[in-house]
């Protein structure tokens, strides 16, 4: 198991990196540009404000069980921008635990999340003020409201403070608290297959697995803050453009890794939806080298915008995908329009952090098989053992080493998802996998959306890949519906490209070129658009409803 002699906190690392490269730009969004020095100063002010409101750590970790929390929680209900990044850093500096709030949630979902988290503070864009106002009377613990001004024109809620006014009201000195590697980072799961759950991470553990605590080239754990600072200061300050919303874990990990490795984060100017033309023009203007996407839903519009030739994107060297399937068809299109770039697939989850990766280059495009990290394994079906490479059986993707403490407030689910195997604690969130003899791991899919038809397991990702490769298909999600004969049957919910015309029979025939007969959809349901989370992840609850209702 990987280890390091130094226990890290995010505030210590961020402060040290910023001191070494104070004038390097950290955040760029349109005309808004902030250096490392400015972001740290602003985040310190936010930390001071949170501390002035009595927020912080009230019970140290050693007195708590893995599913318990001793810190105040701050919800981040905002679009991408400097405020979100400052809020992450400021919360850590105040010993307040930040967590993500999905800005697509309707009233009942938002209420559930804020009640489950027991949040005492919320930072939100003014555009969301009406939604917050609806549920405030039912959330007596939520007492600190910080509103970010935007173009919505919505006025401050009663009892709320303007974000910039909050920063201006306090000193730029960080609060007098002693940071601890046990301080929490909280990440709520997407809730696309069940109710959202708050995953509790120690700062040291999430730093080592997903915030840049490992050398990006060798994978070796960092041994000291001095080593991290030297690496960040000697680097070129690569510009990284983040397309997924920061309410998505992988997007937060990209930002935090950028900070701890001395990179510059670029956000699109359009934040409430993906504007691919704005994206490619920003890539040209800022000479972006790396862009992050989430699956076909983001990559397809990006390819289309590049194909229009409206911007020079020759600076782009890497397209990094994570969080959703990027099919070989779309991956190949990306490589065709970006012949000098590589496409990197990353695998991870809220419960594991970053785990595996795969790189596709011209002439070598593949999906589904990954280079495993040093702490990534495949556990047996019954969780009794770890399967050796070359074992023919299908098991569970498992992660050891730097793993979360548990799920907030749920000891039973914590014990189930984080079992002890051969004396070692693992995170096993529910992905099916095989460990090949050459060391690569084949990711089969999430068990919770697997379809059991006639006794056969059918992974929806494989069917989605087959349907998505038809040129008329803009987007697809696959789900099961009850079948008297098979128990469950496969249904594909499809959105067609503008102007495209194709019938169900043609799509099924196309899929038969790469799928066994029993995996083929028994029906195709056409919809104008596929419902996804803001980050691009498929909403499988919605997909099942469409499959059942036709």
Swiss-Prot record:
**Compartments in which it is found:** Secreted, Cell wall
Write out the entry's keywords from A to Z: ATP-binding, Cell wall, Fatty acid metabolism, Ligase, Lipid metabolism, Nucleotide-binding, Secreted, Signal
User: Which Gene3D superfamilies did the record assign?
Assistant: 3.30.300.30, N-terminal domain of ligase-like (3.40.50.12780)
A GO molecular-function annotation: ATP binding
Please state how the activity of this protein is regulated. Answer: Inhibited by 2-hydroxydodecanoic acid, a typical inhibitor of medium-chain acyl-CoA synthetases.
Q: What induces it?
A: Expression is induced in human macrophages. Induced by acidity. Transcription seems to be maximal between day 1 and day 5 after phagocytosis.
Record's protein name: Medium-chain acyl-CoA ligase Mig
């Amino acid at each position: 198991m990987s280890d390091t002699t130094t226990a890290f906190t995010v505030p210590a690392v961020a402060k040290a990196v910023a001191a070494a490269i104070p004038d390097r730009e950290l955040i760029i969004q349109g005309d808004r540009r902030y250096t490392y020095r400015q972001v740290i100063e602003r985040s310190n002010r936010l930390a001071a404000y949170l501390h002035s409101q009595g927020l912080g750590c009230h019970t140290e970790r050693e007195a708590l069980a893995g599913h318990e929390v001793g810190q105040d929680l701050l919800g981040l209900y905002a679009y991408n921008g400097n405020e979100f990044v400052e809020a992450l850093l400021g919360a850590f500096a105040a010993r307040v635990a930040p967590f993500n709030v999905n800005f697509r949630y309707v009233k009942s979902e938002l209420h559930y999340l804020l009640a489950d988290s027991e949040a005492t503070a919320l930072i939100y864009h003014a555009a969301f003020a009406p939604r917050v106002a609806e549920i405030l009377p039912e959330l007596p613990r939520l007492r600190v409201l910080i509103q970010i001004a935007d173009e919505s024109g919505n006025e401050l809620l009663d009892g709320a403070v303007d974000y910039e006014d909050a920063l201006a009201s306090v000193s730029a000195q960080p609060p007098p608290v002693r940071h601890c590697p046990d301080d929490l980072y909280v990440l709520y799961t997407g809730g696309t297959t069940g109710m959202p759950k708050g995953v509790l991470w120690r700062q040291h553990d999430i730093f080592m697995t997903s915030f840049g605590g490992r050398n990006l080239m060798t994978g070796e754990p960092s041994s000291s803050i001095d080593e991290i600072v030297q690496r960040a200061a000697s680097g070129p300050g690569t510009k990284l453009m983040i397309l997924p919303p920061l309410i998505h874990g992988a997007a937060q990990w990209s930002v935090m890794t950028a900070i701890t490795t001395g990179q510059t984060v670029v956000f699109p100017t359009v934040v409430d939806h993906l504007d691919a033309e704005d994206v490619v023009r920003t890539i040209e203007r800022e000479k972006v080298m790396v862009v992050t996407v989430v699956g076909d839903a983001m990559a397809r519009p990006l390819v289309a915008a590049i194909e229009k030739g409206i911007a020079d994107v020759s600076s782009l060297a890497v397209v990094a995908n994570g969080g959703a399937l990027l099919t070989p068809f779309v991956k190949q299109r990306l490589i065709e329009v970006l012949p000098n770039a590589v496409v990197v697939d990353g695998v991870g989850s809220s419960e594991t952090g970053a785990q595996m990766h795969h790189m596709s280059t011209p002439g070598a495009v593949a999906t589904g098989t990954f280079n495993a990290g040093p702490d990534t394994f495949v556990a047996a079906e019954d969780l009794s053992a770890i399967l050796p490479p070359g074992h023919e059986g299908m098991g569970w993707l498992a992660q050891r080493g730097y793993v979360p403490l548990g799920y907030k407030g749920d000891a039973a689910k914590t014990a189930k998802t984080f079992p002890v195997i051969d004396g070692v604690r693992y995170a096993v969130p529910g992905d099916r996998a095989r460990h090949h003899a050459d060391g690569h791991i084949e990711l089969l899919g999430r068990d919770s959306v697997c379809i059991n038809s006639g006794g056969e397991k059918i992974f929806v990702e494989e069917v989605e890949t087959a349907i998505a490769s038809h040129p008329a298909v803009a987007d697809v999600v696959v789900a099961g519906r009850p079948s008297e004969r098979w128990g469950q049957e496969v249904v594909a919910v499809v959105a067609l490209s503008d102007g495209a015309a194709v019938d169900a029979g043609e799509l099924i025939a196309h899929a038969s070129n790469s799928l066994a007969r029993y995996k083929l959809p028994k029906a195709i349901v056409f919809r104008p658009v596929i419902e996804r989370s803001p980050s691009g992840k498929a909403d499988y609850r919605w997909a099942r409803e469409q499959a059942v209702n036709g």
